[in-house]
Amino acid sequence: MDRFSLYVPNFLPKAEYFGKGHTACMGCGLALGVRLVYKVIGEKINKGKWEVPWKLGIFGVKTESAEAKGTSLLNINKGNGVKGKITICFDYEGINNLEVIKKHIPSLAVAEDFDYVGTASVGYPFDLIDKVKTGMESKGNSFLHILCPCPTNWGFDPDSTVKAGRLAVESNAYPLYEVVKGFYRVTVEIPKPRKVEDYIRLQGRFKKTGEEDIKQISQTVAKEFQKIKERV
């Protein structure tokens, strides 16, 4: 058993609002992301509005057909005297998402003048939980973008979901940061980043990706991360 599995469950909030009986696949990153968010939101989830293009069975939504678009949105009015709402984007990406490294969704949220914008990964649950709390408690509208690795679509072992979520962050392919009224702050610093190739090679969906493509993706990662650092 790794240290993550051994220690993390002991320090997470004990309350559970994400019950059994859903149809999520084994190792589903989306289900893990929803579970962590529910631990913070609690009973307020009853006031939430889902916009779910896929994985409908997880949320008890019945439909005849659903297209795997790669994202699900949850909108919740904050309440308790706090004006505004929080929008949470659970991003499990597409099967052949060659633009996996170029995450423009948080930038779009900043451009839309959200008062609080944050990125999170199921591989870093405490950072995720802290950002949900901040998003719920801060004044104005909040937006949280959560990376939820999908074993089925991405092509990795179901027991590697957390590993995929951590590698995304540790390689700077998916940096964790927050933007409060236009001010940037990196919330998880990686002193010695992993190779982007380690993150890519974990995923079967990129098995045909060549060395030259990986080199270009690595350069893109470096450039995008540098942009964020310059804004801090």
Predicted features and spans:
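Thiamine diphosphate
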Residues: 1-100, 123, 127-130, 230, ...
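Short, conserved beta-strand edge motifs with alternating hydrophobic and charged residues
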Residues: 89, 118-120, 143-147
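Flexible, low-complexity linker and terminal segments
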Residues: 150-232
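Active-site lining segments that contact anionic ligands and/or coordinate catalytic metals
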Residues: 139-143, 174
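Conserved thiamine diphosphate
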Residues: 12-14, 21, 100-138
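Short, solvent-exposed amphipathic alpha-helical segments in soluble enzyme
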Residues: 42, 76-79, 133-137, 159-164
